C-alpha cells in the first residue's frame, strides 16, 4: 500500500441559507473550489490529475447528476480528467476523500482531487410521477433542501424518523438538557468567532467574488453564520423545533442550512514530487459504521473507534477531533460514549452549529480543517468524523 498525502485543502466560505452564495449554482461553487485549489499548486500539470471525486447529498437540481465531472470541466481541467459523484448523505465529502485516498493507496492513481458541494438554498422542489397518464386528486410537492422524500412505505417508520426528533431521542437517552445544548452551541460560536479573528481559516478559505448588477463584484471571504454576539439569553428565547412540549432541540443548538464547497489535492510520493510542495498531512486510516437509524447521531462513536484501531492510535493520541455538529445533542451524546476522550481537543475552531453544514461539502471541509490544523502544529494526529442520516458514521484519521 502506498502512502497518501493531502497536499492542500481549500473551501469556499460557508454561506447562510438565502445568503451571499444563493445566486451561485452548486456546480459553479464546486468549480471555484477546484480552480482555487489548483491555482495554489502551479507546478502541477492539471492533465496529471487522474480522477475527481466529489460528494453531493441532494443531487436533484443544478448538481446535474454528476457534479464531480461537471465541476471539473467548469474549473478548466482537461477533458481527459474523469470525474465522479458519491453520496453518503452528510458524509459525502469525506467519502469522496476516502475513496480518492483508497485509489491512490492501491496504486490505481497517483494524483486525485476530492471534495464536496451543496447548495441547500438552490435545492429544487420535486414532484413524483404518477403511474397513470391523467391522475385524479392531489400530488405532493417535496422540497429537496433537507429531509426524506418519497420514502418507501415498506420502510420501518423508525428508520426515517426526522433528524431533529432523532436528536431529541439522543438527548433523552443521555439526559442532555436544553441548557447543556445551548451552552455547547454558544461555545461553538465563540470558538469560531475567535478563530475568524485570529485568521485561523485564512489558509483554507478561497474567497468567492459575487457579481453585482452594477459595479465591481463583492467578495465573500468569511463564513456567514458565525455569531460573535451569540448569547445564552438569546438562545433561551427560541422555541423547540421538533417537540413543541418539552423539546430541547432548537434552531440555536442545531446546525443551519447552508451553501458551500470544498476541495482537496491528494497524492502519493510520485505525485507529491510533481507538486513541488510539502504536504499538510498524511492519510492514516478510515472507519465506517452503522446503527439503529433513530439514533443516527451516535454512529460516529463506533466509526472513530474503528478508524483509530486501524491507525494503531487511541483517544490519548489525538491533538484534534473535528466532529460535525449536526446537533449539539448529537455531539454531546457521542462524547458521553467516549469516556476516554478529552473534550479539550474537540472542534477547537468551532463547528457546524456556528460555521454551517452544507451537507455534501461538510466532510471535505472537516478533513481540510484537520489537515490545516496539523500543518500549523507541525505534527500530530487528527480525526474528521460525521454522523449520517439513516444511521451511519464515517471517520478519517490524519497524521503529520
Where are these regions (language model features)?
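Conserved active-site "lid/cap" helical segment
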Residues: 1-71, 75, 166-178, 188, ...
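Condensing-enzyme catalytic core mediating Claisen C-C bond formation in acyl metabolism
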Residues: 1-24, 146, 232-298, 302, ...
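N-terminal extracellular/periplasmic Venus flytrap/periplasmic-binding protein-like
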Residues: 23, 27-32, 43, 149, ...
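Conserved catalytic cysteine-centered active-site region
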Residues: 24, 56-112, 144-147, 158-162, ...
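Flexible glycine-/small-residue-enriched beta->alpha junction loops
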Residues: 111-169
Amino acid at each position: 500500500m502506498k502512502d497518501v498525502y493531502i497536499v492542500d485543502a481549500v473551501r469556499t466560505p460557508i454561506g447562510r441559507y438565502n445568503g451571499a452564495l444563493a445566486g451561485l449554482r452548486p456546480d459553479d461553487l464546486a468549480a471555484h473550489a477546484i480552480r482555487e485549489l489548483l491555482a495554489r499548486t502551479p507546478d502541477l500539470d492539471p492533465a496529471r490529475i487522474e480522477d475527481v471525486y466529489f460528494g453531493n447529498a441532494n443531487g436533484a437540481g443544478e448538481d446535474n447528476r454528476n457534479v464531480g465531472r461537471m465541476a471539473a470541466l467548469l474549473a478548466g481541467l482537461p477533458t481527459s480528467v474523469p470525474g465522479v459523484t458519491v453520496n453518503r448523505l452528510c458524509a459525502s465529502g469525506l467519502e469522496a476523500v476516502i475513496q480518492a485516498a483508497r485509489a491512490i493507496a492501491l496504486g490505481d492513481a497517483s494524483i486525485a482531487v476530492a471534495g464536496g458541494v451543496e447548495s441547500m438554498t438552490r435545492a429544487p422542489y420535486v414532484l413524483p410521477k404518477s403511474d397513470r397518464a391523467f391522475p385524479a386528486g392531489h400530488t405532493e410537492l417535496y422540497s429537496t433542501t433537507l429531509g426524506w422524500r418519497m420514502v418507501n412505505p415498506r420502510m420501518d417508520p423508525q428508520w426515517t424518523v426526522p433528524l431533529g426528533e432523532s436528536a431529541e431521542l439522543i438527548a433523552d437517552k443521555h439526559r442532555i438538557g436544553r441548557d447543556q445544548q445551548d451552552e455547547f452551541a454558544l461555545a461553538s460560536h465563540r470558538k469560531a468567532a475567535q478563530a475568524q479573528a485570529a485568521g485561523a481559516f485564512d489558509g483554507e478559505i478561497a474567497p468567492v467574488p459575487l457579481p453585482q448588477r452594477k459595479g465591481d463584484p463583492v467578495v465573500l471571504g468569511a463564513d456567514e453564520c458565525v455569531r460573535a454576539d451569540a448569547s445564552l439569553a438569546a438562545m433561551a428565547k427560541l422555541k423547540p423545533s421538533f417537540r413543541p412540549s418539552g423539546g430541547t432541540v432548537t434552531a440555536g443548538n442545531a446546525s443551519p442550512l447552508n451553501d458551500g464547497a470544498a476541495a482537496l489535492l491528494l497524492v502519493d510520493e510520485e505525485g507529491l514530487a510533481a507538486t513541488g510542495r510539502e504536504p499538510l498531512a498524511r492519510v492514516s486510516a478510515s472507519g465506517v459504521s452503522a446503527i439503529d437509524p433513530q439514533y443516527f447521531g451516535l454512529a460516529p462513536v463506533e466509526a472513530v473507534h474503528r478508524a483509530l484501531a486501524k491507525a494503531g492510535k487511541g483517544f490519548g493520541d489525538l491533538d484534534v477531533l473535528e466532529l460535525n455538529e449536526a446537533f449539539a445533542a448529537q455531539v454531546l451524546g457521542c462524547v458521553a460514549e467516549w469516556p476516554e476522550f478529552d473534550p479539550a481537543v474537540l472542534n477547537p475552531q468551532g463547528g457546524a452549529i456556528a460555521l454551517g453544514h452544507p451537507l455534501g461539502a461538510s466532510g471535505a471541509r472537516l478533513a481540510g480543517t484537520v489537515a490545516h490544523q496539523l500543518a500549523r502544529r507541525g505534527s500530530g494526529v487528527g480525526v474528521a468524523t460525521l454522523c449520517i442520516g439513516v444511521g451511519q458514521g464515517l471517520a478519517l484519521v490524519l497524521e503529520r
